[in-house]
């Protein structure tokens, strides 16, 4: 059984037992988090939401809060001696999918 959930402005296909990385959620490590925006549930019986499936939830356990690899953004304007260098690390949350309730 699998489901498609929406979190952080993205749609993610998940299965039970799968580990996923999502945009940072405001929860502590070890807590459980429930996704209510389930767009699709597949498996033996298929349920398609319009826009979400009524009563369907996906429960996950928070494994880790972290930050991704650093990217460097460098901008400049030619012949003007104007340049700027910035770094960015995107925060994320690592989850393990426990149960898909449909």
Swiss-Prot record:
SUPFAM superfamilies: L21p-like (SSF141091). It comes from the Bacteria. Keywords: Ribonucleoprotein, Ribosomal protein, RNA-binding, rRNA-binding. GO terms for biological process: translation. Residues 80-91 have a biased composition (Basic residues). One of its GO terms (molecular function) is rRNA binding. Residues 80-102 are annotated as: Disordered. InterPro entries: bL21-like, bL21-like_sf, Ribosomal_bL21. GO terms for cellular component: cytoplasm; ribonucleoprotein complex; ribosome. The keyword Ribonucleoprotein applies. Pfam families: Ribosomal_L21p (PF00829). Part of the 50S ribosomal subunit. Contacts protein L20. Belongs to the bacterial ribosomal protein bL21 family. NCBIfam families: L21. This protein binds to 23S rRNA in the presence of protein L20. This is Large ribosomal subunit protein bL21. It comes from Staphylococcus aureus (strain NCTC 8325 / PS 47).
